[in-house]
Amino acid sequence: DIIIVDEASFVSTDSIEKIIEVYKSSAFMFVGDPGQIESIEFGNWFDLLLNLLKAKDVVFTLDVEYRTKVVELTKIWDEVRHGKKKNIIELLSAYEMTEEISDDIFKVQENEVVLCLNYDGLYGINNINRYLQASNPNDAFEYQQNLYKVGDPVVFITNDYSAYGIYNNLSGKIVGIKNEEENITFKIELLESVSYFGKLSNEIEIVEEGSGFYAIVTKMKYYNDKYDTDMDTRTKLPFQISYAMSIHKAQGLEFDSVKIVITKESDEQVTKNIFYTAVTRAKKNLKVYWQPEVADYVLGNIENSEESKTADLSILSEQLKKYI
């Protein structure tokens, strides 16, 4: 048997140890991008493994870029991978992909996302979502104290229907809202194809219309049973508005245009992996919004972390040579 572990960089050391223990008689294929965000729990085993085994003819790099044909973007990505502060800032400046924080952040475009580190504050996810939704001229419908409009971008936040193609982080756009006395129904255009059509539950149905795929989500507005302990689940929508989102949430997604906002309040959170994940979400346009001192701090940390990692790998390699 061959066990394939996808998004390997996101798997914790504890989890991969358990997987190997369960399937210890199997062969393993680990697939992922070591430059992207590491596991929330402890462990950067995937990155270490690649460096330790790269001379053993078991590491293969897929070097054909499918996300973008924009040469400037691929050059930026390469420089971030290498972690050289001077080269990164020079390219960002030369390609006009860096700018001081301004109101330009609040000018919305089609298939664009604003990536942030924090939820609160003027340039946090919550406020940017409110502001950009307010610029949507369509009528607003309130449900569970939140507003929704036709044209709002959304991202699904459930894995309950992953077997049918509706998975956590699936992107879509609201194209219809039917507001009735007892129910509210959302028609969401899915930005990825699905393999199943029909009712997934009493609340979600997948339909195909022309060349498009749509999720029809219906929720009851009210539950009269005060003893219904499952009421929150029954009324909670499986998606949320996504004009802006966290960089962690954006992992695995791609957009025509990406704006990254890094403020003084959040600069300490930006690791090399987080910054790399953010800039590689863009297919066509990229802009990083930060003050000069923030850019200097963030890119300095990225360069220092790369030097520290190189030293750690050298020590670890010497210790493990006798086992490999």
Predicted segments — roles?
Residues F10-S12, I37-E38:
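Catalytic P-loop NTPase motifs of RecA-like helicase/translocase cores
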Residues T13-S26, L48:
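Short, conserved "post-DEAD/DEAH" coupling segment immediately C-terminal to helicase motif II
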Residues L48-L49, S257-I324:
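Helicase C-terminal subdomain and adjacent C-terminal extension
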Residues D1-I2, S25-M29, N285-K287:
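Loop/turn-to-beta-strand initiation segments
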Residues N138-Y276:
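Conserved nucleotide-binding/hydrolysis modules and their immediate coupling elements
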Residues D6-E7, G32:
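Walker B catalytic acidic pair
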Residues G35-E180, I184-K187, E192-G198, T218, ...:
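Conserved helicase motor core of P-loop NTPases
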Residues E21-K24, L53-K54, T280-A282:
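Short, conserved loop/helix-junction motifs that constitute active-site signature segments
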